Amino acid sequence: MSETLATDATTPAEKKDFIRQIVREDLASGKHTVIRTRFPPEPNGYLHIGHAKAICLDFGLAAEFGGLCNLRLDDTNPAKEDPEFAAAIQDDVRWLGYDWAQLRHASDYFEVYYLAAQKLIRDGHAFVCDLSAEQVRQYRGTLTEPGRHSPFRERSVEENLDLFQRMRAGEFPDGARTLRAKIDMASGNINLRDPALYRIKHVEHQNTGNAWPIYPMYDFAHSLGDAVEGITHSLCTLEFEDHRPLYDWCVDKVDLVGHPELLQPLLDKGLPREAAKPRQIEFSRLNINYTVMSKRKLTALVEEQLVDGWDDPRMYTLQGLRRRGYTPAAMRLFVERVGISKQNSLIDFSVLEGCLREDLDAAAARRMAVIDPLKLVLTNLPEGHTETLQFSNHPKDESFGTREVPFARVLWIEREDFAEVPPKGWKRLVPGGEIRLRGAGIARVDEVIKNADGDIVALRGWLDPESRPGMEGANRKVKGTIHWVSAAHAVEAEIRLYDRLFSVEKPDDESEGKTYRDYLNPESKRNVRGYVEPSAALAAPEQAFQFERTGYFVADSRDHSASTPVFNRSVTLRDAWAK
């Protein structure tokens, strides 16, 4: 992809968070003339809502300041990575409304990393260690006790270079040796206690095949990847704050800016020379109640078939949220409202739902659908009576136009809109009572039909002929208005009523001996058969509607068709979880 300026999907008012203030100061002082950021996910799973915050920040920041943002796939652990995940990541970024200046892979820089590691060895900053993983843990020490030097720490430069070259040649089995940095085994920051820079893994790589039996560790590859790409502001969440000293150590000791010869493999590949010294800046991660965002736990939900795959609309993956009906605009609005800070906090899920309601209230056309149908026969209309009514597609926006809705003698209405024995304050249908049928006139119930078990199966009533649209009687006051669909014309649809996957605010809380599995909400998905007006059935996959008086729904991206409509409830009209 050609190097183009990042384009933000929104043009918000100037934001005042601490990261943007740093960027403004860096530009004003002349420290940087062009801002460069990157979004560097590992392609070992699907992105979740927490990644949306990072995406919007990385790409949005570059766009706001006329800079560039790369998408870099951190493919340094091939045993857990898959091209399927890499493709999904790219799809998710574009879905959110962003595009990258360049698509890069950490594997593009494997030769640079190798040369950098050799430089560290020559400079006396790295050594090949023969300790096993368990022995390394024993030597590392604790938070209160310093670590001990590896017995292999004082190998000569020549021996280290030879062993590292033989590691590269594939002479040794997995786990036999590592390349470690020489930093400080007494440091209070355990990340600085001679961390591993390379490990042996005889695993085929998706991009490089079997060319490399050794792979760089995350901290080494991540910091140098930023330096290689000339990233000015490397943004990450607070859990990496303790890694920043190691990040800076790698950048400073390798010094790609001062040693351009290390970048020759990039030039050989036709990649530009852009090296610079990056600055890591940490911000709070996104934590939302009623969710889990651990990749391990999300994977378990899928593998244990507790959900219907990574794009299950109850999942907090971007693929799942998209299938649920969440929009890019709602996601960006949510990130903007959450804001950027250094203080971890728990965001209420209702904030996310509110952003979706706000977006769809403006963006979604209206349709009528009946979720739990009850038949209403208007006996004063002739058998076979059918007419066409004109309905506005959006009560607040004339640009949405109008549509034709068939009206007939037999209708489906919501079962919950009738009460044989109404509670106090009831404003819908009752025996002998009147109600306004949305856009059609005023109806009265005269007879309740029951089956042998005493269940209500139908209502028989009367439509006031003087209350039809355009007539003076149409303005007659009645207690309420209900929606309906014509029984003869409506299309039967599968309607999936989704709700929050977990029933408690903190499903990660295991203080009572329970796990997140114990808090799964049994009502998180209900499949019902209902009826939608004909124009709704013709929706394209992922087309959103407000089903009047019911909620916001989206045509399912996988299963929906005009002949077999499937709609997912994205969000209710009001917060059903409000306390």
Curated annotation (Swiss-Prot):
It is found in: Cytoplasm. It catalyses: tRNA(Gln) + L-glutamine + ATP = L-glutaminyl-tRNA(Gln) + AMP + diphosphate. GO terms for cellular component: cytosol. GO terms for biological process: glutaminyl-tRNA aminoacylation; glutamyl-tRNA aminoacylation. InterPro entries: aa-tRNA-synth_I_CS (IPR001412), Gln-tRNA-synth (IPR004514), Gln/Glu-tRNA_Ligase (IPR050132), Gln_tRNA_ligase_bac (IPR022861), Glu/Gln-tRNA-synth (IPR000924), Glu/Gln-tRNA-synth_Ib_cat-dom (IPR020058), Glu/Gln-tRNA-synth_Ib_codon-bd (IPR020059), Glu_tRNA_lig_a-bdl (IPR020061). Its EC number is 6.1.1.18. L-glutamine binds at D74, Y218. A motif ('KMSKS' region) lies at residues 292-296. GO terms for molecular function: ATP binding; glutamine-tRNA ligase activity. A motif ('HIGH' region) lies at residues 41-51. ATP binds at residues 42-44, 48-54, 237, 285-286, 293-295. The keyword Aminoacyl-tRNA synthetase applies. Keywords: Aminoacyl-tRNA synthetase, ATP-binding, Cytoplasm, Ligase, Nucleotide-binding, Protein biosynthesis. Pfam families: tRNA-synt_1c (PF00749), tRNA-synt_1c_C (PF03950), tRNA-synt_1c_C2 (PF20974). Belongs to the class-I aminoacyl-tRNA synthetase family. NCBIfam families: glnS, PRK14703.1. Monomer. PANTHER family: GLUTAMATE--TRNA LIGASE, GLUTAMINE-TRNA LIGASE. This is Glutamine--tRNA ligase. It comes from Xanthomonas oryzae pv. oryzae (strain KACC10331 / KXO85). The lineage of its organism: Bacteria, Pseudomonadati, Pseudomonadota, Gammaproteobacteria, Lysobacterales.
